[in-house]
A protein has these predicted regions:
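Pyridoxal 5′-phosphate
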Residues: 1-372
Length: 372
């Protein structure tokens, strides 16, 4: 066990280094061989990675593919939808969504003719409430971008409630599951689009993102970002006979990257082999310890939801100042506790390598550094 509280950044698990090394050594051997086995083997590895994700979130076969990151996934979706679906309508996002996605949508408004509406955080609060998000959501909303778990507060959206409202409004629901998948149970259910990363609680590599598109929506998507791998047969090179694959492969484009998927497979195997419920229980025990101790610390303010069922796997705490937050992170690092901060917000995410003893010691250190 260790003082590692950075699962919101990069996830890890016991034995990760050796297992990833084994996977990458195998890749190196195959990729460097002087024969023609490379691509068949590597594309099979990529397909295995995709199936692992499908199994993890209950997605039907053929509804997922790889992307480099969630920003590219969302861009591919926007460029795939019929013009009349977006033009003159709204895309709804919360003020606590992942900034990269907001940056993207802001830049695409003029070209695609939609208006980006950002639902604000209430005065004096830290995250956008589900009821406020739903309150801003009418039948003129083409896409609702839902952050399942916030990266700044760990607030977890009620996806059942949101999905029900989305169906009533005829809206495409896009769920960003990056900060929650692998540490809380998640199923695609009736959600239209899911984007996510393997980097956090799935203990994988950067570059191993995914996109899921509901089967009924797939048939109307024609991604403008397309290429030879968008086709049923990538080796169909007749310029005049391009056709999209009838499954999620239509969201592929050029030659796919495989290395990130290979480096991430051990983490996916660990999560599926251990069980998300088991990992969630351990995490909930540790995060509840932090929440309880922060509540008794008069110098720190909890910005995550108080109730465990409303949180993801992290606990976010507000320091008195930006300078204090940075100083706390530095001091904790010197004491072998690893966390980070965003402005005044300290972020703590315990996982499978984090023990109760280390969590209690972290809380003791926070008390010492803030209230003496």
């Amino acid at each position: 066990m260790s003082g590692y509280f950075l699962y919101h950044s990069i996830g890890t698990y016991p034995g990760k280094a050796e297992q990833v090394k084994t996977a990458l050594d195998r890749y190196s051997d195959i990729w460097s061989a002087e024969n023609d086995s490379q691509w068949p083997a590597m594309l099979a590895e990529r397909a295995h990675f995709i199936r692992s994700w499908e199994n993890l979130i209950g997605a039907p076969a053929g509804t997922m593919t790889t992307v480099e990151n969630v920003t590219l996934a969302l861009y591919s979706l926007i460029g795939a939808l019929p013009d009349e679906l977006l033009r003159g309508r709204r895309i709804l996002a919360a003020a606590d969504c992942f900034p990269s996605l907001h940056f993207l949508l802001t830049g695409l408004q003029a070209r695609f003719g939609f208006t980006l509406e950002t639902v604000p955080v209430r005065q004096g609060e830290s995250f956008v409430r589900d009821e406020d998000f739903i309150g801003a959501w009418g039948n003129d909303v083409a896409i609702a971008l839902v952050t399942w778990v916030s990266s700044t507060t760990s607030k977890r959206a009620d996806m059942d409630l949101i999905s029900k409202h989305g169906r009533q409004q005829g809206t495409i629901i896009v769920a960003d599951v990056t900060q929650g998948v692998g540490i809380r149970p998640f199923s695609v259910g009736e959600i239209d689009v899911v984007v996510g990363s393997s980097l956090k609680w799935l203990c994988g590599s950067s570059g191993a993102g995914v996109i899921y598109v509901r089967p009924g929506l797939l048939t109307v998507c024609e991604p403008e970002l397309r290429g030879w791998f968008s086709q049923p047969d990538p080796f169909s090179w007749d310029f005049d006979t391009f056709a999209y694959a009838d499954d999620a492969r239509r969201f592929d484009h050029g030659t796919p990257a495989v290395l990130a998927a290979i480096a991430s497979q051990p983490g996916l195997d660990f999560v599926s082999g251990t069980g998300v419920d088991v990992l969630a229980l351990h995490n909930e025990q540790l995060t509840s310890m932090i929440v309880e101790r922060v509540a008794a610390n008069t110098a720190l303010t909890l910005v995550s939801p108080q109730k465990s069922q409303e949180r993801g796997g992290s606990v976010m705490v507000q320091a008195v100042s930006v300078e204090q937050a940075a100083a706390i992170v530095t001091t904790l690092k010197n004491e072998n506790f690893y966390c980070d901060c965003r402005s005044r917000i300290l972020r703590f995410s315990p996982g499978s390598v984090t023990s109760e003893e280390e969590t209690a010691a972290l809380c003791d250190a926070l008390d010492r550094l803030t209230i003496g």
